[in-house]
Amino acid sequence: MNNQRKKARSTPFNMLRRERNRVSTVQQLTKRFSLGMLQGRGPLKLFMALVALPRFLTIPPTAGILKRWGTIKKSKAINDVRGCRKEIGRMLNILNRRRRTAGVIIMLIPTVMAFHLTTRNGEPHMIVSRQEKGKSLLFKTEDGVNMCTLMAIDFGELCEDTITYKCPLLRQNEPEDIDCWCNSTSTWVTYGTRTTTGEHGREKRSVALVPHVGMGLETGTETWMSSDGAWKRACRMETWILRHPGFTIMAAILAYTIGTTHFQRGLILILQTAVAPSMTMRCIGISNRDFVEGVSGGSWVDIVLEHGSCVTTMAKNKPTLDFELIKTEATQPATLRKYCIEAKLTNTTTESRCPTQGEPSLNEEQDKRFVCKHSMVDRGWGNGCGLFGKGGIVTCAMFTCKKNMEGNIVQPENLEYTIVITPHSGEEHAVGNDTGKHGKEIKITPQSSITEAELTGYGTVTMECSPRTGLDFNEIVLLQMEDKAWLVHRQWFLDLPLPWLPGADTQGSNRIQKETLVTFKNPHAKKQDVVVLGSQEGAMHTALTGATEIQMSSGNLLFTGHLKCRLRMDKLQLKGMSYSMCTGKFQIVKEIAETQHGTIVIRVQYEGDGSPCKIPLEIMDLEKRHVLGRLITVNPIVTEKDSPVNIEAEPPFGDSYIIIGVEPGQLKLHWFKKGSSIGQMFETTMRGAKRMAILGDTAWDFGSLGGVFTSIGKALHQVFGAIYGAAFSGVSWTMKILIGVIITWIGMNSRSTSLSVSLVLVGVITLYLGAMVQADSGCVVSWKNKELKCGSGIFITDNVHTWTEQYNFQPESPSKLASAMRKAHEEGICGIRSVTRLENLMWKQITPELKHILSEIEVKLTIMTGDIKGIMQAGTRSLRPQPTELKFSWETWRKAKMVPTEPHNQTFLIDGPETAECPNTNRAWNSLEVEDYGFGVFTTNIWLKLREKEDLCCDSKVMSAASKDNRAVHDDMGYWIESALNDTWKMEKASFIEVKSCHWPKSHTLWINGGLESEMIIPKSFAGPVSQHNYRPGYYTQTAGPRHLGKLEMDFDFCEGTTVVVTEDCGNRGPSLRTTTASGKLITEWCCRSSTIPPLRIKGEDGCWYGMEIRPLKEKEENLVTSLVTA
């Protein structure tokens, strides 16, 4: 083992002397010199070269170099740089002489001011291009040369997509959590972030959108009987039974009569009550074609139109018409909101503050186009702060929407329905759904719901339609995205977490919830990245699963829905009624074709002479004894010889003969129709139930089971009315009811099944016809009993004050009336004046319903209905029908019957005394007119609708005027004015239940010519007819008669216990006077100047009065009771 100590390596210190070597090695000298140069020491020229070297190599200088650079003398540094510039110039000349590009050499020069320099809020602001990435940026400031280092990794092309933030001042410390810093003063920097491919940074995730499935929106496409449909049906049955106890009892009687066991009776009753409320269920598909047959002698019929269906109407002595609803469009929808589903961000700017320096702010925060966010971030020495801690940071970016989707509100008044009407003319394609040249196209809108269509050769048909879209537009929003549209629930639409604009905002700058499409990344010390989410179109399509898609055509939106129309046929006429029957021979052009509706189409050709003529066609049984079936094409005619004619008919089930023409040459065609009459009965009943279900609560005759019975009653009246009238003429209605009850009771207790069914049927019909009052289409005068008859209800007779009235005014729709009243109140109308006392009774009956309808939509208005005393005063304004009606549900009806509404400060006065707060000049008057006569228990319902325009005339539909032999009468439901011919026509008597302020219409006035208004006994302003029949020699207009009493009897006779003499000494004409004084004393002596005897007498509730021409002879004026009225 070698124990010898190894030689120590030479060290800079002598271990014995403990001192440094006097002479340094070459390595030590080189190292010492290099470190000194990097720390800023050494010769100036060498230092200047060392400063240029990092610029060439894009290496950041050290702190020592930067310190020396700031301390050297300016003149010496400039001289050295100029000398360097001369040397570089010589090098450029040499290179230029070599005719080669010297651009590479130029890139070696330090890039001083190679960027755009500006200021921001008084501080330097660099706008840097992509070429400066990773370089030190130098520019001169008041404190000297400022060098900024930019090490950002998201450098891109300079465009509108930029990032702006502040580079902090950093001299001694190492940079921390920053990518830009400066050595002299903090500086703003802006650079672009767009890549060479033109893409922007964005997030690919989508917003969390709630699916639309399960929102429970009725859109017209739901399946009948969903999972919870059974419970809804049970609820409807319960509420219907509570609302219609009378008809429920009748249904129970029918069920008990028909059923033989308790189970059968219960099942029949449940089925009846289940069908009855089906009018509240919507969206049940109806058959492709529906046959609606009008009542004989009726002037109108109700039909239901739906897309994809055709309705054929038939009525006696009227042409057969086909109706088809071909299009329902929504135009000019109002925009509710505009949602942004794709956006971009530009001009991102960040400002930050050190701890304890307060909250940072940006001017962009005041600009509504920007989306901003405040955060906190760690700060310290490494990012320009003197203290460590949390500092504030705010980042803003300009939000621009690239793609929108809109939510629109569809108003019912913006819906337009297109209907095609085609008469069965026998020409080709004139059967079924014809939209070609034979059809007449009309358009229906809520603003013009009444439309007339001129059918060439067949007259004019009037349609009054009421839309039934099956949609609650208060809960529906129409969402449009590019060229597609959906019906969505309003609340779901309003809750979408997307940036949106109000519909009224046309500039698009004030977008709300912009942050839902923006993601702010975790902030750095001086910078925060902001990205925008990707397009949300795909996410919206996913969320819209289950929503109903709507078709669009020419920018308009196509809807489903139903149209309930009242078809008025009074102006229709059959073409060819005056033609004679065809006597020639017919030929079958094409074999009989059976349609899917149970009808047949026969195409025949006439080969005889004498055209135009009517085609004889009958369908008979095999024995050719009984005519069966019916003609769909009413009164088929031939217009030209050898021209084919189409005839549609409905043969009975089984075998039958179709006979065309007359003998000889008569065509006899055998036909067999498959099917069952009983089955067809059930099928027709189901079709009627579906038609009921489509229309909803108020649209159809079948508004309830009572409506079903009422509709059956129309047929019963037509079939059995004449027999019933003959059998029970002169019998009171109580006796009729009693007879019906007895017959029904006997039938229910009969042991014979056939006898029991027959008696029950007869009893029920007797009960129905006895209890129900049917109305015709107007009023006529009964001369025998001196009465006005409207339908079978007698109203005005000689004994007017017994009030044996059988009429009841009803509004066409309380919800429509409430809508008109709300609009009137908004326009400053404070109340209503009734035209007749029946109208006043109607207002009293429906006031609770109107109150609840208005309270449901939170209209704070109290409706108060008062009584009528004396004259029915006139107003000067009127109610106007509105395009939309208010909601009127069964809950509202039930509350109106049971729960009073809360009073409000604002009132709407109906009748009652005139007050200063609501004078007659500010009240609506004469706004209603008779729309139709209907059915009712014990009374005839008269349905009223709102007038389209103002009118001073009384409603002519409750008036009549007639003249026969030597008698004439003008009458309505409150007046009976009778005149007689005795040498000349003159008034005999008049009865008044009320005194109206409307004008008697000329259409119901006899002998208009020749009469002066000043000579009319009953003034024109009090509904006196301007006629010679309203005249009496010696008397003038009774403008100051005692009409303040209301009920009056006017005739020509002496008041009891008084005398009247004609003398020139009599007093002047004046207000009517009562024959008794205020104390009850009878004034016996009266006179007149030139009036005829007997005098004009007026009987009121307080006694007997004389006309204005009759004056007292002796009584003092202060004792007289005078009339309070001046016309």
Curated annotation (Swiss-Prot):
GO molecular function: protein dimerization activity; structural molecule activity
Protein's recorded name: Genome polyprotein
Chain segments carrying region Hydrophobic: 37-72
Stretch list, region Interaction with host EXOC1: 1-15
Transmembrane segments: 102-122, 239-259, 266-280, 726-746, 755-773
Carbohydrate-modified residues: 183, 347, 433, 905, 982
Extracellular side of membrane: 123-238, 281-725, 774-1127
Residue ranges of the propeptide: 101-114
Annotated GO biological process: clathrin-dependent endocytosis of virus by host cell; fusion of virus membrane with host endosome membrane; symbiont-mediated suppression of host innate immune response; virion attachment to host cell
Free-text note on domains in this protein's UniProt record: The transmembrane domains of the small envelope protein M and envelope protein E contain an endoplasmic reticulum retention signal.
Coiled coil: none
SUPFAM superfamilies reported for this sequence: E set domains (SSF81296), Flavivirus capsid protein C (SSF101257), Viral glycoprotein, central and dimerisation domains (SSF56983)
Residue spans, topological domain Cytoplasmic: 1-101, 260-265, 747-754
Pfam families, alphabetized: Flavi_capsid, Flavi_E_stem, Flavi_glycop_C, Flavi_glycoprot, Flavi_M, Flavi_NS1, Flavi_propep
Cystine bridges: 283-310, 340-401, 354-385, 372-396, 465-565, 582-613, 779-790, 830-918, 954-998, 1055-1104, 1066-1088
Keywords: Clathrin-mediated endocytosis of virus by host, Cleavage on pair of basic residues, Disulfide bond, Fusion of virus membrane with host endosomal membrane, Fusion of virus membrane with host membrane, Glycoprotein, Host cytoplasm, Host endoplasmic reticulum, Host membrane, Host nucleus, Host-virus interaction, Inhibition of host innate immune response by virus, Membrane, Secreted, Suppressor of RNA silencing, Transmembrane, Transmembrane helix, Viral attachment to host cell, Viral envelope protein, Viral immunoevasion, Viral nucleoprotein, Viral penetration into host cytoplasm, Virion, Virus endocytosis by host, Virus entry into host cell, Zinc
Start and end residues of each stretch annotated as Fusion peptide: 378-391
CDD domains per the UniProt record, alphabetical: Flavi_E_C
Site (Cleavage): 100-101, 114-115, 205-206, 280-281, 775-776
